[in-house]
């Protein structure tokens, strides 16, 4: 079974979107506790904090996205952004690398860790 690799930017955006939905769900659950104001307020505050956390994550990924290197994917020929030494295409999940020493090797996200970079040299 082959693992499906996805783009790092898309992973973080998906996490931020899930934080929005989780926050709204927590606030919605808080409505069911109208008779218990303390529980309702705690649920509303936790939900609000989850939505605020998603805003922070979206801001962070926006900053990262501006630093990512735009490349043209050789498979789908669409522009995508590469974060780190290895990443996947945003459109077709094709493994991509910016490091010539990794060309032709099996795709592994561990190549982005500093320990892996030291062991390669």
UniProtKB/Swiss-Prot annotation:
GO terms for cellular component: plasma membrane. It is found in: Cell membrane. The chain crosses the membrane at residues 14-34, 41-61. It is a multi-pass membrane protein. The keyword Glycosyltransferase does not apply. Its main location: membrane. Belongs to the UPF0295 family. This is UPF0295 protein ABC1323. It comes from Shouchella clausii (strain KSM-K16).
């Amino acid at each position: 079974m082959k693992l499906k690799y996805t783009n790092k930017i898309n992973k973080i955006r998906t996490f931020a979107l899930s934080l929005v939905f989780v926050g709204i769900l927590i606030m919605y659950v808080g409505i069911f506790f109208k008779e218990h104001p303390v529980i309702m307020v705690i649920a509303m505050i936790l939900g609000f904090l989850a939505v605020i956390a998603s805003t922070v994550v979206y801001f962070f990924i926006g900053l990262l996205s501006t630093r990512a290197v735009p490349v043209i994917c050789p498979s789908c020929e669409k522009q995508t952004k590469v974060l780190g030494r290895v990443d996947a295409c945003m459109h077709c999940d094709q493994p991509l690398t910016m490091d010539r020493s990794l060309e032709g090797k099996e795709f592994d996200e561990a190549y982005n860790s500093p320990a892996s970079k030291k062991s390669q040299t």
